Amino acid sequence: MEDVIPAKRTFGRTIMETRKELGLSQKELAAHIQREDGTPISNQYLNDIEHDRRSPTGRHLIEQLAKVLKLGPDYLFFLAGQFPEDVRRHTPDPEHFAQAWSAFRRSLKDGGKR
């Protein structure tokens, strides 16, 4: 029997899969996500995000996507390659950061079983 390799978890794939699980169309989700000027994002922009052709341009977009899709914003920030604002404000010295990052990696490897 052949092993199935799971698809890589990406920001776009997570947005698309969760949107579909909630029964939302791209048009419906795009209407709920607003740019900084208050206008909704376009269906095409959301499509590009979902297919990992573009990244969200602002932290506020990630926070809105998390809220509408009922996802943890920290998880979306992680998938987008960003740190949440509260973490960025409290950046420790390099040694403390290395220790925290190492602990984070260990936690991911052992599935949080510690």
What residue spans do the PLM features occupy?
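Interfacial/linker helices and their anchor residues that mediate assembly or domain coupling
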Residues: 80-114
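Short, basic-rich loop-to-helix N-cap that marks the start of a DNA-contacting helix
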Residues: 40, 51-67
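Short, solvent-exposed amphipathic helices
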Residues: 64, 75-78
